[in-house]
Amino acid sequence: MSDSLPHLTDRLYLTHTGAETDLIFRRGVDLPEFASFPLLETDAGRAVLSAVYADQMAAARGFDCVTILESPTWMANGARAEPLGYDKAQLQRANIAAVAFVADMAGAQTLISANLGPMADAYGPAAHQDPDIYHDYHAQQIGWFAQTAADMVSAYTVNHIPEAVGIIRAAQDLRLPVVMSFTVETNGYLPDGTPLAAAVAQVDQQTGAYAAYFMVNCAHPDHLPPDFTALERVRGLVANASRCSHADLDNATALDDGDPAELGAQLAALRARAPHLNVLGGCCGTDARHLRAIARAVLA
């Protein structure tokens, strides 16, 4: 369905990047290093991942939405997977297998997104490096994605401009559609203090506006900047259920799943003000209840 990417239509696309918190807190699954891709190595792990994806697809199907299935590869890059004992060859196999697993589950009205995360902790302090450093680092995983049936590459929870630029350039090298999702703090700014609008503009300027579109994830609607709905290059919001800060969420020992109906109403209000905002979904603390509530509120 690569000819039907979200920026080419006004249809509603429903996605979910909250699988890890769903797995840990609702399904009782242990995820060392917060990585879900190792679950694919066992029958039990594959079964529980299948259940998460099946719930998402059912939620979208109930409201005639297009589903974006994110591969469980957010932590499947070199530095983040190293503590799990994966060498380069094992990690390559894991990434390719993860996208294949999701593709095998896909039905009609489904997009396959090869999901990648930042080189370092998305919420921790990090010294910015040259975009070329991030390009070379992420080119490995993006190159593996190029060998799969993924419709696009989606970078989630990116927190500064140089890494976003490097990722997009690496995807551009291989002519792969790429989506860039920034995260913002409770004040609406990127963790390094950059305004979202400035981040989008600077990344576009440095990459020839190659990204298909931008998004925000791992943030509650209350935390968005006032100009959010005016940013037409930002076509998606994958929201947290909780209003807590990233620091509080990192230290949480219990799940804050918020109010699904309230979250759905908030995203529907944003979509009403910004019709270009057509990729919606749930991040930390969300599950199929939130996805149904979002679709119900938006399409009511």
What are these model-predicted stretches?
Residues 1-300:
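Domain-level signal for soluble alpha/beta catalytic cores
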